[in-house]
């Protein structure tokens, strides 16, 4: 999360590049709030600035995400509630794209990039989005992910994530047993390395 919205998909310790080098291209996914726009328009530095400006009605073109973060923290002048909501909306829009990726690639999510420093304001939006329900025309309701989502930045959630609830199940008419994941789960973590060291 930074100037733009990017992702790297790692499967069995190998970076997914895809047949055309487009593996992990989340930036071009559909934007939840503006379906005619790309996701990156709501998940980027410019998105934080735009949303803050929309919420306050004041020109924010000279503000950086760090400025808006400081406003959210209450250490700089400005609309604190609008600043928090600006990062929260980025989280919601990122969460929508992450859901789509996770329904194909089932694995841990690590958030990084320049804007990830505001994770405490972004993660609630991501978590709320990833825990929402979707439905059918018949009226049935399903979680948008088959897995329970854990914010690994929170100790209690981290400890629960580590709990093993899997078991071995006997195959009918056989002596063989197979591993059964009783508890489907996904963890969301925030990188502490920074983009330069991570790459």
PLM regions with names:
Residues 31-199:
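ATP-binding/phosphotransfer module of carbohydrate and carboxylate kinases, centering on a glycine-rich
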Residues 1-46, 162:
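Glycine-rich phosphate-binding loop of actin/hexokinase-like ATP-binding domains
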């Amino acid at each position: 999360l930074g100037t733009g919205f990017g992702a790297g998909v790692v499967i069995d310790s190998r970076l997914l590049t895809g047949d055309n080098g487009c593996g992990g291209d989340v930036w071009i996914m559909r934007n939840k709030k503006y379906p005619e726009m790309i996701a990156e328009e709501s998940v980027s530095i410019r998105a934080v600035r735009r949303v803050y400006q929309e919420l306050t009605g004041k020109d924010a073109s000279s503000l950086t995400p760090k400025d808006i973060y400081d406003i959210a923290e209450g250490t700089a002048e400005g609309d604190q509630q609008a600043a928090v909501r600006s990062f929260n909306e980025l989280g919601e829009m990122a969460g929508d794209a992450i859901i789509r990726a996770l329904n194909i690639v089932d694995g841990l999510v690590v958030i990084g990039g320049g804007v990830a420093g505001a994770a405490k304001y972004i993660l609630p939006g991501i978590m709320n989005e990833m825990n929402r329900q979707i439905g059918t025309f018949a009226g049935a309701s399903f979680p948008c992910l088959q897995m329970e989502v854990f914010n690994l930045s929170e100790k209690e959630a981290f400890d629960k994530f580590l709990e093993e609830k899997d078991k071995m199940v006997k195959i009918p008419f056989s002596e063989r047993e197979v591993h059964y994941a009783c508890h489907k789960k996904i963890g969301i973590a925030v990188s502490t390395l920074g983009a330069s060291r991570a790459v």
